[in-house]
């Protein structure tokens, strides 16, 4: 069913759809960030967000300070030494349609305040499907290499990268004193096929695809193994450069890389409109099969480095770049069963069990069915022949049914209204404000549901949370069922309890002296986690990695967050403080308050904090006049856009709030400032002009 045109809607109709979309997007955010189990493709998610934004543009009454957050990476393995990226190594946002490309260009122009007639140069280049890597050269000499990791910390793969023939030990010409070159390590189709032949002849497992082969080869503990693998590299970006970049444009930087002897992709071109970008996308897509290496889209980047600096970043991706992904590959197969999985928040997720089929070079035997509404809408039945795709080339999903192949005995699927694990009622929560039912059905078993407890423990120890090496899903399930770990604090008392136990962990099947010692050491190394990781690990509803980072930066310590969360009753100053953190909003504020209001959570935290001491995050900038201060922008700004001003303030270490309160340190007011300016005067908060702000931060 097609959506009703927005210009044909009444305010009441728009409000209903806005509420429904908000609930749906919030549910998708929750499943992506907190449960690591997204149920829609990036393309579908982006379309939902765009529709949501279009409704607010047409009906400004619907807009609120709340923002929806974006995604994240994976923590480095304990098997490698870690390298802290001096400049974060972030990922790109994705688009999947020509309309979204046009929207990207329009957003960039709006953010920069460019008039229609002003030229905007944007590069286009193939998106290599490999493993991102950062190479550091000092005085022209290659000295270090690191994987992306979680974007802030990666794995030290220096010895392995030295074996890649295309990467010079010394750069040609006169490169900067310090140059961090970033790019993609990949494997060609021919090399991949030849390597799999050797694997088969040696009786070893075959690699699924060139990307997996490249990633596995680069992350070998023995560099001699990497040396025997045919890896290649394309340079396309950079991190730290001292004393200054050798060029002022993206094209110029890549040309400089080439002059230094680094391999760059020859298909990179300069475009000046969305139409030219789309034409280049089509051209590269036509060449895709003949390139000899895997690509999964085309990357667009604003060419000017000055404009890139102005555009800055949103969440964990740049505003000045985006990846235009190729359509996901599809296949048909038979759906043999529908299994209901229970997540750590009690969400019941239907998973299709399929006859194995190859999609995009990967064998798929399971696919998401999203939720009960999607099953009903698509009328998916056990025994149906279904169309599946790897959404965004990653997450398999069922697209629909091939009706002319439906068996006569296939019956409509009835979604369970009780938890398949603990038998508790499973309900769809109703939003008290909107009256809209949640798209996800949840088990009400809470603390008595083993599935939820196990999934919460898995999340707590997962890579993007506390990242406890050796304590994976399988181990947690085993330890839970054996009564060894039933709550987070149990992880940190495991070694002490094991010493007193009659049957030692090392004597269990699958364990031994070494693996047990390594596990205990990994646990010990997580007694002082970064505050943002600790907050994320707690599994607070609506608090994914991005919001955990925002809360950590704002409060600085877990005790401060806990104190505010305890006091965050509706209408309180504490609730307002959380709500006013830029990008957080009321939904998260309510979830934080609910979490700390639950006595069982408080008991679990007391037990956990007896063994764990969360550490404050490193400040972005600590030596600026506004570092640590809470600022509010109001009225029209003349030298920069509102988004640009907020991004600048955050880079300088300030906290940007959406409204004025007693905790506001500074209000920057432009022409047309209204209620916020009046509130600042009432509370005695210092108010300055945009010009004074720029002088204060040294940007006048």
Swiss-Prot record:
Signal peptide: none annotated. GO terms for molecular function: DNA ligase (NAD+) activity; metal ion binding. SUPFAM superfamilies: BRCT domain, DNA ligase/mRNA capping enzyme, catalytic domain, Nucleic acid-binding proteins, RuvA domain 2-like. It comes from the Bacteria. Belongs to the NAD-dependent DNA ligase family. LigA subfamily. InterPro entries: BRCT_dom (IPR001357), BRCT_dom_sf (IPR036420), DisA/LigA_HHH (IPR041663), DNA_ligase (IPR001679), DNA_ligase_CS (IPR033136), DNAligase_adenylation (IPR013839), DNAligase_N (IPR013840), NA-bd_OB-fold (IPR012340). This is DNA ligase. One of its GO terms (cellular component) is cytosol. It is an enzyme of class 6 (ligase). Its cofactor is Mg(2+); Mn(2+). Its EC number is 6.5.1.2. Residues 621-700 form the BRCT domain. The active site is at 127 (n6-amp-lysine intermediate). It comes from Methylocella silvestris (strain DSM 15510 / CIP 108128 / LMG 27833 / NCIMB 13906 / BL2). GO terms for biological process: DNA repair; DNA replication. Keywords: DNA damage, DNA repair, DNA replication, Ligase, Magnesium, Manganese, Metal-binding, NAD, Zinc. Zn(2+) binds at residues 419, 422, 443, 449. PANTHER family: CHROMOSOME TRANSMISSION FIDELITY FACTOR 18, DNA LIGASE. It catalyses: NAD(+) + (deoxyribonucleotide)n-3'-hydroxyl + 5'-phospho-(deoxyribonucleotide)m = (deoxyribonucleotide)n+m + AMP + beta-nicotinamide D-nucleotide. HAMAP family: DNA_ligase_A (MF_01588). NAD(+) binds at residues 42-46, 91-92, 125, 148, 184, 301, 325. DNA ligase that catalyzes the formation of phosphodiester linkages between 5'-phosphoryl and 3'-hydroxyl groups in double-stranded DNA using NAD as a coenzyme and as the energy source for the reaction. It is essential for DNA replication and repair of damaged DNA.
């Amino acid at each position: 069913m097609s959506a009703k045109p927005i210009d044909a809607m009444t305010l009441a109709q728009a409000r209903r759809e806005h509420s429904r979309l908000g609930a749906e997007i919030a549910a998708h955010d929750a499943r992506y960030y907190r449960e690591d189990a997204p149920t829609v493709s990036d393309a579908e998610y982006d379309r939902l967000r765009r529709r949501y934004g279009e409704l607010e543009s047409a009906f400004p009454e619907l807009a609120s300070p709340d923002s929806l957050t974006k995604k994240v990476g994976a923590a480095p393995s304990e098997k490698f030494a870690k390298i802290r990226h001096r400049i974060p190594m972030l990922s790109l946002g994705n688009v999947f349609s020509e309309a979204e490309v046009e929207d990207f260009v329009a957003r960039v122009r709006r953010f920069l305040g460019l008039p229609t007639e002003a030229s905007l140069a944007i590069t286009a280049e193939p998106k290599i499907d490999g493993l991102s890597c950062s190479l550091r050269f000092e005085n022209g000499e290659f000295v270090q290499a690191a994987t992306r990791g979680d974007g802030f910390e990666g794995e030290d793969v220096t010895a392995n990268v030295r074996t890649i023939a295309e990467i010079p030990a010394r750069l040609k010409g006169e490169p900067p004193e310090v140059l961090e070159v970033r790019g993609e390590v990949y494997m060609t189709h021919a090399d991949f096929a030849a390597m799999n032949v050797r694997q088969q002849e040696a009786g070893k497992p075959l690699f699924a695809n060139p990307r997996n082969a490249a990633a596995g080869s680069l992350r070998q503990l023995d560099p001699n193994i990497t040396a025997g693998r045919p890896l290649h590299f394309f340079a396309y970006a950079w991190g730290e450069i001292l004393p200054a970049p050798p060029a002022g444009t993206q094209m110029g930087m890549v040309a400089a890389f080439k002059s230094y002897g680094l391999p760059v992709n020859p298909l990179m071109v300069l475009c000046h409109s969305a139409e030219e970008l789309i034409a280049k996308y089509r051209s590269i897509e036509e060449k895709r099969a003949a390139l000899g290496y895997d690509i999964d889209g085309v990357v667009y980047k604003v060419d000017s480095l000055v404009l890139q600096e102005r555009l800055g970043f949103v969440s964990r991706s740049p505003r000045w770049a985006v990846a235009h992904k190729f359509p996901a590959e599809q296949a048909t197969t038979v759906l043999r069963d529908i299994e209901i999985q229970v997540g750590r928040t009690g969400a019941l997720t239907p998973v299709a069990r399929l006859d194995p089929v190859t999609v995009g070079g990967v064998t798929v035997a399971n696919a998401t069915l999203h939720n009960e509404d999607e099953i009903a809408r698509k009328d998916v039945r056990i025994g149906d022949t279904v169309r599946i795709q790897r959404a965004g080339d990653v997450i398999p999903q069922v697209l629909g049914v091939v009706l002319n192949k439906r068996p006569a005995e296939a019956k409509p699927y009835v979604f369970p209204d009780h938890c398949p694990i603990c038998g508790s009622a499973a309900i769809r929560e109703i939003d008290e404000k909107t009256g809209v039912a949640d798209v996800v059905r949840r088990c009400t078993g809470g603390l008595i549901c083993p599935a939820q407890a196990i999934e919460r423990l898995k999340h707590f120890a997962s890579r993007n949370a506390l990242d406890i090496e050796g304590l994976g899903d399988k181990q947690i399930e085993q330890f839970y069922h054996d009564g060894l770990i039933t709550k987070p604090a149990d992880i940190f008392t495991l070694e002490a309890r094991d010493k007193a136990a009659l049957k030692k962990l090392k004597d269990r099947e699958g364990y031994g002296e070494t693996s047990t010692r390594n596990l205990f050491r990994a646990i010990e190394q997580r007694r002082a986690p970064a505050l943002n990781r600790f907050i994320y690990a707690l599994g607070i509803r609506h608090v994914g990695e991005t919001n955990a980072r925002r809360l950590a930066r704002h409060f600085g310590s877990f005790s401060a967050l806990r104190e505010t969360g305890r006091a965050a009753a509706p209408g309180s100053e504490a609730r307002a403080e959380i709500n006013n953190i830029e990008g957080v909003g009321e939904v998260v504020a309510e979830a934080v308050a609910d979490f700390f209001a639950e006595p069982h959570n408080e008991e679990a935290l007391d037990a956990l904090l007896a063994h764990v001491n969360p550490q404050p995050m490193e400040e972005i900038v600590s030596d600026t006049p506004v570092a640590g201060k809470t600022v509010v922008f109001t009225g029209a700004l003349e030298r920069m856009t509102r988004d640009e001003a907020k991004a600048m303030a955050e880079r300088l270490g300030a906290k940007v709030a959406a409204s004025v309160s007693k905790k506001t340190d500074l209000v920057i007011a432009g022409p047309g400032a209204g209620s916020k300016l009046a509130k600042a005067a009432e509370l005695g908060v210092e108010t300055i002009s945009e010009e004074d702000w720029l002088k204060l931060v040294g940007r006048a």
